[in-house]
């Protein structure tokens, strides 16, 4: 619903009762601003600016949003852009903690919107944006602590598009962002805020005056050196020498020199064994440094850089290799609490490493394929084993880690169309199947074990068994005691299975287990849930099971078609569409070719008419001729007619086709025509014509004569007899 401009101006005289209809009208009805007169335009802008100057927070917020809407009109932005910028900058400068935060966020968003509208237009950028840009950057940095997420994102965009103007503020912004990293609660910040801080720090090398790529490379190597120094602390708790490859991997990473220790981003750690919680500083430090390194190598830059993928993968391999299942604790670490904390820190480090590897696959895609075998090997180390079997209890305890593990493997499998070696994936398949198995609650399992143990002891008195009823429920309705599997785990496992069956030929054991799980889940989702809908991941998994049957001798198509009856892809298998028969279509290129074809058809019709005319004439004269003459004349025209018809038929059937004017839909085998010749027997000598009277028996047709006699009547000279 649109409001007339006069009513809009009237509403803006004072405090509008509701700004939503005004915003909707000015935003959707473009004709109002496109056809506005100069006087109405001035009234509209002045009244909106009066709202932004109002001390009332609602009016200030309404005026700020109205500025954002009217800036879509180029005429208003060109004529009043400087005034609009000035009022927004004043509101930003006067903001304090007593004002509602909505005023600050709407002001920053309006300024960013105006910058985006002006950016790229040389004259407006020079006259309006450039003079205000330094003031905007200064105010953003001063108000950073009020709304860090939106302001940091705004600063990152200004660094990207105006690196030269931002150069004087680079060191100040870097110091502010590193202050956030030093906070103890930084790891508890929201993920969008942490990601914005990491990416803004990674974009700062762009403001360098010369050789920004060298500054970027120096920052990346400094982060790798700092990560190495943090990971080396585990040598105080674990015997890293148990793994012979770990010392070699540490040697491959660069180290800080004596004069470079001040280049560290984070301060030194203080770990006290008497305070076991201080050990968590290791995983916190690894989390920050690894995510910052991730931002450097995955965030796009305006200049070319040389990414040290080899060193990055070595860092991740060291993190995954520091595993307490394969590396023993040192003898002086006897406190069980410290041991558990050290184990927890290694799990957290592995989780961050898996996320990093997944981001590398998304960013560099095919460039990661040469390292695929190495990556799968280091991920395989994270699968929990006990007595040569997967430890189910540990698997469930570290469910988040194993879920991310399968997700990372799925991403790397999506980079290839086929993988010949399936041995590295068998453990991951077993992990996925175990994660989606029905889970019995611990209390139920413990109660069941206690009952078994009590039955195996001494005989008790025959008192009433108080545990019979709950035990009977467990035996008869076990599915009601199963623990619900997280939806995120189910979706990731389904995606992983879909990626596996489409890229790898698994052994029969694992393949049949996957097929069994697929069918059970499909039937359950189709008939035993309230909505009777198949989830997207399960639908994709069912279709891939049909397309890639593996060792199945019997197709899953009938079962899957029953469950997914509306799928268009499966309908192709159930109702195959055969291709049409090849048809020759003449391709008329121009009018001259079309006219030539018409002329050929006319000539052909004319020839047929010429052939038919003598036949019609003979048919008229046949009744007047004697039988002997008729018999002789019937013989000759028939031979000529048969030859001509044969030639016409051959031209129609065996005409050579020009490939440039004919479209072939399918190759066909060339058929050679069988030539058949009609031999007409002619007498070797023709006797002299003798006048003979007509005989009734000679009227029999030669063609109907079955004895095939060689006798032929001589020609009768009818004309001569008539003249006489």
From Swiss-Prot:
GO cellular component: nucleus
Principal location class: nucleus
The keyword Metal-binding appears for this protein: no
Record InterPro entries: ARM-type_fold (IPR016024), RIX1_N (IPR012583)
Region (Disordered): 444-464, 592-644, 656-724
A Pfam family hit: RIX1
Claim: DNA damage is one of the keywords in the record: no
Function: Component of the RIX1 complex required for processing of ITS2 sequences from 35S pre-rRNA and the nucleoplasmic transit of the pre-60S ribosomal subunits. Regulates pre-60S association of the critical remodeling factor MDN1.
Name of the protein: Pre-rRNA-processing protein RIX1
Provenance organism: Scheffersomyces stipitis (strain ATCC 58785 / CBS 6054 / NBRC 10063 / NRRL Y-11545)
Gene (name only): RIX1
């Amino acid at each position: 619903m649109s409001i007339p401009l006069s009513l809009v101006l009237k509403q803006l005289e004072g405090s509008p009762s509701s700004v939503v209809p005004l915003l909707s009208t000015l935003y959707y009805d473009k004709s109002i601003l496109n056809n506005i007169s100069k006087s109405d335009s001035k009234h509209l802008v002045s009244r909106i600016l009066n709202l932004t100057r109002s001390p009332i927070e609602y009016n200030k917020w309404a005026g700020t949003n109205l500025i954002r809407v009217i800036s879509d009109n180029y005429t208003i932005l060109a004529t009043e852009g400087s005034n609009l910028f000035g009022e927004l900058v004043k509101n930003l400068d006067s903001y304090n903690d007593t004002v509602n935060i909505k005023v600050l966020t709407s002001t920053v968003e309006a300024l960013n919107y105006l910058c985006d509208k002006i950016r790229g237009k040389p004259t407006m950028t020079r006259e309006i944006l450039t003079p205000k840009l330094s003031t905007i950057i200064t105010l953003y940095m001063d108000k950073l602590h009020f709304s860090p997420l939106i302001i940091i994102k705004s600063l990152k965009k200004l660094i990207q598009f105006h690196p030269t103007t931002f150069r004087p503020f680079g060191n100040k912004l870097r110091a502010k962002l590193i202050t956030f990293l030093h906070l103890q609660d930084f790891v508890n910040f929201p993920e969008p805020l942490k990601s914005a801080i990491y990416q803004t720090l990674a974009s700062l090398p762009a403001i360098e005056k010369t050789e920004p790529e060298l500054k970027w490379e120096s920052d990346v190597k400094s982060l790798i050196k700092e990560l190495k120094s943090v990971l080396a602390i585990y040598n105080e708790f674990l015997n890293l020498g148990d793994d012979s490859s770990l010392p070699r991997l540490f040697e491959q990473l660069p180290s800080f020199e004596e004069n470079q220790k001040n280049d560290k981003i984070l301060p030194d750690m203080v770990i006290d064994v008497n305070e076991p919680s201080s050990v968590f500083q290791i995983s916190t430090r690894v989390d920050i440094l690894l995510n910052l390194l991730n931002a450097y190598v995955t965030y796009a830059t305006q200049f070319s850089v040389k990414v040290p993928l080899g060193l990055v993968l070595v860092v991740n391999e060291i993190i995954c290799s520091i595993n307490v299942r394969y590396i023993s604790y040192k003898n002086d670490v006897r406190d069980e609490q410290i041991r558990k904390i050290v184990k927890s820190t290694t799990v957290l480090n592995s989780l961050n490493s898996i996320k990093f590897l997944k981001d590398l696959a998304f960013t560099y895609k095919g460039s990661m394929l040469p390292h695929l075998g190495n990556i799968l090997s280091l991920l395989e180390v994270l699968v929990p084993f006990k007595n040569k079997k997967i430890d189910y209890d540990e698997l469930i305890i570290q469910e988040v880690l194993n879920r991310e593990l399968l997700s990372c493997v799925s991403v790397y499998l999506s980079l290839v169309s086929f993988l010949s070696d399936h041995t590295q994936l068998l453990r991951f398949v077993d992990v996925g199947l175990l994660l989606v198995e029905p889970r019995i609650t611990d209390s139920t399992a413990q109660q069941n074990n206690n009952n078994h143990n009590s039955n195996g002891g001494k005989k008790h008195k025959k008192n009433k068994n108080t545990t019979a009823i709950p035990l009977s429920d467990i035996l008869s309705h076990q599915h009601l005691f199963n623990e619900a599997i997280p939806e995120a785990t189910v979706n990731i496992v389904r995606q992983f299975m879909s990626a596996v069956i489409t890229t790898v030929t698994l052994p029969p054991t694992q393949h049949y287990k996957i097929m069994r799980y697929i069918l059970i889940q499909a039937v359950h989702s189709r008939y035993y849930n309230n909505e009777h809908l198949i989830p997207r991941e399960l639908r994709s998994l069912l279709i891939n099971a049909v397309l890639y049957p593996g060792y199945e001798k019997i197709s899953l198509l009938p079962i899957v078609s029953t469950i997914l009856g509306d799928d268009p892809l499966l309908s192709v298998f159930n109702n195959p569409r055969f291709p049409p028969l090849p048809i020759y279509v003449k391709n008329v290129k121009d009018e001259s070719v079309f006219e030539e074809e018409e002329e050929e058809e006319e000539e052909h019709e004319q020839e047929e008419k010429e052939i038919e005319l003598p036949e019609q004439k003979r048919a008229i004269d046949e009744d007047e001729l004697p039988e002997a003459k008729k018999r002789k004349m019937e013989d000759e025209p028939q031979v000529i007619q048969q030859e001509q018809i044969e030639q016409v038929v051959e031209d129609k059937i065996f005409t050579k086709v020009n490939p440039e004017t004919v479209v072939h839909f399918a190759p066909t085998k060339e058929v050679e025509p069988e030539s058949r010749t009609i031999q007409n027997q002619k007498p070797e000598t023709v006797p002299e014509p003798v006048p003979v009277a007509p005989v009734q028996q000679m009227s029999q047709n030669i063609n109907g004569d079955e004895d095939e006699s060689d006798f032929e009547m001589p020609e009768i000279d009818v004309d001569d007899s008539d003249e006489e």
